[in-house]
């Protein structure tokens, strides 16, 4: 099935010409009156204009968030939970529409937005609705005369900066726990994909008290920086590049603002020789696991962009990979048969092609792809790159630096010790994959890989109840899982003495 182009007569999606900020439950024009053009990576054409916000707009959003905080933070956990459930239901009833919006704004295949992005977005709201209903403070008797208990309380007004690779899902990762905890939010979407969250607010805005969620659009260096440097936020959450994350942390540190940051990765996908002990469905799953590096066009922070394969199976492994890659269907993101869509922007497209050239220049062997995959007709202006495979060594730039595109760098290892060394030989520590039939190898590797998430015999699973976050330069803090609530709460300890006699010290 091929969905009609948005704004066409037969499409269910019609974008407005201009999108404003969403502040205090209302759509507000930017203070400067300026807007920026928003381009679809599907065809390279501008399809709307979006508010280019400044610090004045951020201040208005913070005013609204502060005004709403007292009421929202004292709303019962039951009512907050019910609102999150209603949000999930509303998204679910508009799933197909939002999937089209997300694909057009980002360039990803609609089969992914229909089957992954939107269902996971819905599930995260439902999960945190359940978490806040079941959260309990700890209480204990210290001695026969002293009782203590702990109260989780909303941390306050939260600034959230969202990346462009999963606009709605990454918003849900941050919004759901923050709202559940009783916080109010000022959210800044990525300027590359600003419309998805605005479309969402048109759908769910009536379910949320005014000022609880505020969306301010614009460039990171303007609106994003104003939010990150504000002294009026009580918490900052950011997902994006390590370079920008470093700047964000410095801004927050100047104001002693607690921060959660999820940054880059260069994740290894490790294949042990026993995967070839049988020609079965498991082996087929292993090969598919390697190609998951092309999921979302490789624009995933945990992208398994480094494949480490045992030298004894290298030739057989590569033959199967090439055979499978050649069958990948790339093209129209609105076609449900499409497996790889367009890169998010011209800037990202050029960056990826630049890294492909670096790989060639530094002597890596180009095994497959390595060039644009130009489309025809109305897709001709889009940003499409052929899935690319390189063979090289772990010190090359294409092994050490995050490309964020459909590029896999492959190398060999001789034993488990070398595999572990190669896996950990990176400044990043976000994710890793281990593929083996041997449970002992699986446990040893999972324990010793320095990464926040290790997938064993699977990859790219992101359930709401599994904690996500990085080691090393891949981030600080965790998202998803109930422990995320603690990032949006202060813990108050109450210590009560029922001893009537004084201490006798003074």
Swiss-Prot record:
Protein's recorded name: Aldehyde dehydrogenase
CDD domains tied to this protein: ALDH_ACDHII_AcoD-like
GO molecular function, one term: aldehyde dehydrogenase (NAD+) activity
Pfam family, one: Aldedh
EC numbers, comma separated: 1.2.1.3
GO biological process: ethanol catabolic process
Family, as annotated: Belongs to the aldehyde dehydrogenase family.
Metabolic or biological pathway, per its Swiss-Prot or TrEMBL entry: Alcohol metabolism; ethanol degradation; acetate from ethanol: step 2/2
SUPFAM superfamilies assigned to the protein according to its UniProt record, in alphabetical order: ALDH-like
Gene3D superfamilies: Aldehyde Dehydrogenase, Chain A, domain 1, Aldehyde Dehydrogenase, Chain A, domain 2
Source lineage: Bacteria, Pseudomonadati, Pseudomonadota, Gammaproteobacteria, Vibrionales
Active site positions, chain numbering: 262, 301
Reactions mediated catalytically: an aldehyde + NAD(+) + H2O = a carboxylate + NADH + 2 H(+)
Protein origin, superkingdom: Bacteria
UniProt organism field: Vibrio cholerae serotype O1 (strain ATCC 39315 / El Tor Inaba N16961)
InterPro entries named in the record: Ald_DH/histidinol_DH (IPR016161), Ald_DH_C (IPR016163), Ald_DH_CS_CYS (IPR016160), Ald_DH_CS_GLU (IPR029510), Ald_DH_N (IPR016162), Aldehyde_DH_dom (IPR015590)
Cited PANTHER family: ALDEHYDE DEHYDROGENASE B-RELATED (PTHR43111:SF1)
Cited function: May be involved in V.cholerae virulence, as its expression is under the control of ToxR, a transcriptional activator of several genes associated with virulence.
Ligand binding (NAD(+)): 240-245
Keywords from the UniProt entry: NAD, Oxidoreductase, Virulence
